[in-house]
């Protein structure tokens, strides 16, 4: 995963890390080393965990989703659709721990010998949305971004409209991370209320 250029949370070889810290490391900064460590801890190998991922996708009724790895790196047989990613996010948010992690703007991992102050992480999408935009009464409460050269910048977000309705938005193929944010803000503005940059 290092050689493939995957994004990392910052954990290092030999570091003892809790499952909680790995979960945050996998989601908040999209740490591929965290997803691989979680897979090893839960299923014994990445391959076995990917099998579990595909079984879960089938249990959710997804017919256009297939996983080949835990990092999201490109593979011709690793694919989904924006609709099915929305269904995955909807299911994840029903899990209390997943909802907490997906909603975290910032997180600091426990102190370790390698990171005496704890590894600091930021969900840059949520940070930008929360601090640089006014959403006109609507709220983006959770988000997970992703990037590959093939899919470009993608994001799945969840939020609330001013009248309290739950909304999930999934976008793909944005040229930059900034465009990805602007896509979500534009959709929020159109369907959930006004949104203005501060």
Predicted regions and their residues:
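A short acidic, often aromatic-flanked loop/helix-cap motif at beta-alpha or helix-coil junctions
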Residues: 1-2, 75
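Conserved catalytic neighborhood of penicillin-recognizing serine enzymes
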Residues: 2-36, 116-133, 140
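Alpha-helical scaffold elements that line and support the substrate/ligand-binding pocket
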Residues: 22, 26-43, 49-53, 85-88
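Penicillin-recognizing serine hydrolase domain
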Residues: 44-198
């Amino acid at each position: 995963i290092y050689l493939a250029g995957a994004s990392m949370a910052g954990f290092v070889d030999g570091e003892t890390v809790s499952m909680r810290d790995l979960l945050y490391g996998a989601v908040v900064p999209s740490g591929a080393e965290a997803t691989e460590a979680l897979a090893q801890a839960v299923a014994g190998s990445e391959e076995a965990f990917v099998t579990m991922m595909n079984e879960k996708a089938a249990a959710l009724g997804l017919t256009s989703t297939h996983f080949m790895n835990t990092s999201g790196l490109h593979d011709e047989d690793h694919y989904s659709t924006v609709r099915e990613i929305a269904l995955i996010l909807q299911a994840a948010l029903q899990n209390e721990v997943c909802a907490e992690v997906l909603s975290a703007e910032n997180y600091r991992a426990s102190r370790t010998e390698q990171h005496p102050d704890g590894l600091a992480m930021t969900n840059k999408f949520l940070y930008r949305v929360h601090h640089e935009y006014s959403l006109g009464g609507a709220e983006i409460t959770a988000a997970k971004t992703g990037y590959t050269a093939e899919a470009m910048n993608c994001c799945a977000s969840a939020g609330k409209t001013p009248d309290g309705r739950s909304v999930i938005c999934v976008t793909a193929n944005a040229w930059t991370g900034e465009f990805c944010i602007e896509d979500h803000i534009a959709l929020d503005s159109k369907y959930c209320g006004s949104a203005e940059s501060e």
